[in-house]
Amino acid sequence: MYKNFNEGMIEVITGPMFSGKSEELLKRIRTLEYAKLKPLVIKPEFDTRFSENEIVSRAGVKHKTHILKNINDVYFLLQEDKYKAVVIDEAHWFNEELVKVADDLANKGYLVIVAGLDQNYLREPFGPIPNLLAIAERVTKLQAICVKCQHAASTSFRKVAASEINLLGDFQEYEARCRKCHNAGQKEKLQKKV
């Protein structure tokens, strides 16, 4: 997984909803634990979809996690034990401070692995992930399957009429779509408004 991991680095796992980001992150956690590199696993307080105190993949794989409201609280947790890595799921719900914290932790020698959406439902850069991508040593961009045409999907299409950017949801609110089908869906939504 990593060649000569002996210094800090940042890895970002990104892609649309339903692409397996949490599953990929859980694989990284298992590898770290197998190698006796203890990870501090966290997620934002905002993410309560499947569990309040666990990362849960759609395949049902789970791992206990610490819940943080403020990403700077990670420094207090790091004092509790000899962690070698910091693993963050649903990182797009943290603010831009995450970029500074991740960079600082990597500079201090931690392996920082972050999973989150890089785009919102409008296909615009979302949260801190785009800036993390710029400073990451390793990037894994996953794809889902478009529910309309079954081609590779790179976007999360919002099916409901809500306009706020931060809308927690799952299959009822979102679906994976390719660029073409996403654009067609957005056009259809606009026509319904008229």
From Swiss-Prot:
The active site is at E90. The keyword NAD does not apply. Zn(2+) binds at C146, C149, C178, C181. GO terms for cellular component: cytoplasm. Pfam families: TK (PF00265). InterPro entries: P-loop_NTPase, Thymidine_kinase. Keywords: ATP-binding, Cytoplasm, DNA synthesis, Kinase, Metal-binding, Nucleotide-binding, Transferase, Zinc. ATP binds at G15, P16, M17, F18, S19, G20, K21, S22, D89, E90, A91, H92. It is found in: Cytoplasm. Disulfide bonds: none annotated. It is an enzyme of class 2 (transferase). It catalyses: thymidine + ATP = dTMP + ADP + H(+). Coiled coil: none annotated. Its EC number is 2.7.1.21. It comes from the Bacteria. Transmembrane segments: none annotated. One of its GO terms (molecular function) is zinc ion binding. GO terms for biological process: DNA biosynthetic process; thymidine metabolic process. Homotetramer. Belongs to the thymidine kinase family. This is Thymidine kinase. It comes from Metamycoplasma arthritidis (strain 158L3-1) (Mycoplasma arthritidis).
